[in-house]
Regions:
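Conserved beta-strand hairpin/beta-sheet module of binuclear metal-dependent hydrolase folds
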Residues: 29-78, 190-208
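Metallo-beta-lactamase
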Residues: 119-195, 286-297
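Cap/insert and terminal regions of metallo-dependent hydrolase folds
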Residues: 97, 112, 196, 202-291
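Bacterial N-terminal signal peptides
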Residues: 8-18
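Divalent metal-coordination and catalytic microenvironments
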Residues: 53, 63, 75, 92, ...
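Bacterial N-terminal signal peptides that target proteins for export
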Residues: 1-8
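Active-site metal-binding motif and surrounding structural segment of the metallo-beta-lactamase
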Residues: 69-118, 224-234, 238
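Boundary at the C-terminal end of the N-terminal hydrophobic targeting segment
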Residues: 19-23
Length: 297
């Protein structure tokens, strides 16, 4: 029997047009919500960083910017629904990545937030009650907790109601989505814990980085625990005060030694580093200013 074309289409779709439409793959992309360059469409520039990552059907907020009001303004201007997030990743404790939590938690108070695990961290933390050296010869009044400490000591946070999950090892948090912790050895940020987001794609890993305080090469090296090849690096590389010679070395190393395919620098990468990376990566340099959307494989 031959059916009219519209009827045949409905039968092929199980008599339901919405069902057919729902078979389309969800978008895979990164949208820059917060940065100090770019903009347009009523967006407000400010020093800080935040992106929305859409990948594998997940909606992931990575960092929240420097000012809750600016973050809220940009989110609304871009039509982003923060109630519809699968989880949040906070790269590190600095205020230009965390301040927007104050707005986020008014909109989505129960969202899961992955954050670095630190002994006395701003995201809250816990240590064994015996983490300190004790002296049993002291009188009780001079001993912590009268010499009988709790099994675990928990430490406060400016966001006590938030659902923080602390990360201190490479962790797959969704299919194809991993969080990679690294530790800074740089003077000024010594021992700072930082999380980067790694997405598996057919072309290799996509690394979303906040500030790269531990060093972008250190982060790329650590990503080998997830996959051997990095297709794209997006975010802050913390070269904003780095001398030209070191910028040139790092840009060349990312391209020639680590064989990174594409780079989309933002935030604290710095203007001289933008120029150097564009020279080295040429057509594989991607602009990633405020309001930009970059499609992922």
């Amino acid at each position: 029997m031959r059916f009219p074309k519209p009827l045949f289409f409905l039968l092929a779709c199980g008599m339901s047009l919405p069902t057919c439409a729902s078979t389309q793959a969800p978008p895979s992309r990164v949208t820059v919500l917060y940065d100090a360059f770019g903009g347009g469409a009523g967006l407000t520039r400010d020093w800080g960083f935040a992106v929305l990552v859409e990948y594998g059907g997940k909606r992931i907020l990575f960092d929240t910017g420097n000012n809750a009001e600016v973050f809220a303004h940009n989110v609304r201007a871009l039509g982003i629904d923060l109630k519809n997030l699968d989880f949040v990743v906070i790269s590190h404790r600095h205020g230009d990545h965390t301040a927007g939590l104050n707005y986020l938690l008014t909109v989505n108070p129960s969202v899961k937030i992955y954050a670095p695990k630190e002994g006395f961290g701003v995201f809250g933390a816990a240590l064994p009650g015996t983490f300190y050296r004790s002296d049993s010869a002291l009188p009780r009044r001079m001993r912590y907790f009268d010499g009988r400490p709790p099994v675990e000591l928990t430490f406060g946070t400016p966001w006590p109601a938030a659902h923080f999950v602390w990360i201190d090892s490479v962790t797959e948090v969704a299919p194809g989505v991993s969080i990679i912790p690294t530790v800074s050895q740089t003077p000024g940020t010594l021992e700072l814990r930082e999380l980067s987001l790694a997405l598996r794609t057919p072309d290799g890993l996509i690394l979303i980085v906040g500030c790269s305080h531990p060093g972008i090469e250190t982060i790329v090296e650590a990503s080998a625990r997830v996959a051997n090849h990095v297709s794209l690096i997006l975010g802050g590389l913390h070269l904003v005060t780095t001398p030209d010679a070191e910028i040139e070395r790092i840009a060349t190393s990312l391209h020639d030694r680590w064989h990174v395919d594409r780079i989309a620098p933002g935030h604290c990468t710095g203007e001289p580093a933008f120029a150097a990376l564009e020279r080295v990566f040429k057509a594989r340099y991607l602009y990633a200013g405020l309001g930009t959307t970059i499609d992922l494989p």
